[in-house]
Amino acid sequence: MNLLVHINAICLVLFLSSNTYAQNQIVADLSQENVKISTDFQGAKILLFGAYDGQEGDDIIVIVTGPKGLVTVQKKEKVLGVWVNTRKVNYINAPKYLSISSNKKIEDILNKKTQKISEIGLNNLKIRMQPGIKVENEKEWRQALTRNMLKSNLWSINENSVSLNKDALFRSFLILPSNVITGQFEVKILHYRNSKLISQQINSINVSKSGISAEIYDIAQNYSTLYGVFAVFLAVLVGWGSNLIFRKV
């Protein structure tokens, strides 16, 4: 608690004395800007804190977006009594991580039209299917994408999780799960007043691998053929060794 008090006090002093105060009316910082993923990585909890030139009733929304890329959704059907993947759809620009936090319900901050224009909300993301793919019930595929990402903790909506203090200070905890991918993450802090954007700031978090996991990842990316051959060889070796042990037993 004392640490948070000191952080808030320092943040407020920096805010009131900086040029950013006059320009953006909001300043923010992170307790950790670099996250290292090792073999025993269990996730990360990062404190976002800052100050803003606020009034009673102002709102803060924090959006953390990870690298965008290919995300595959597969459809399973029962064939001869066995569940198998029968169809798949690729989304080519889906965020691999997305967290939206706010000081209260988003619907109480922004109307549906503004949410859609600003891409705030999981259903408002402008995500495209891979060109050439034609499917029926596109809405169901999109719902499946959202459901899968929520289930894997890679997407989340965290309303009422941003704490505001005296219309001047704010803080929130950002949670990165253990299965988070590497790359540059954008942290966007939005300050609203009567549903209108007053100010904003963008910070970043860098997530990278370290130790032996980084070396394995580099080999897999840069020497994919060699890595594949080694993986097959290792699997054969383990199988042969297990068979030999059980044969002796």
Where are each of the predicted segments found?
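Extended, hydrophilic extramembrane loops/domains of integral membrane proteins
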Residues: N179-K209
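Membrane-proximal low-complexity regions enriched in glycine and acidic/polar residues
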Residues: K78, V84-P177
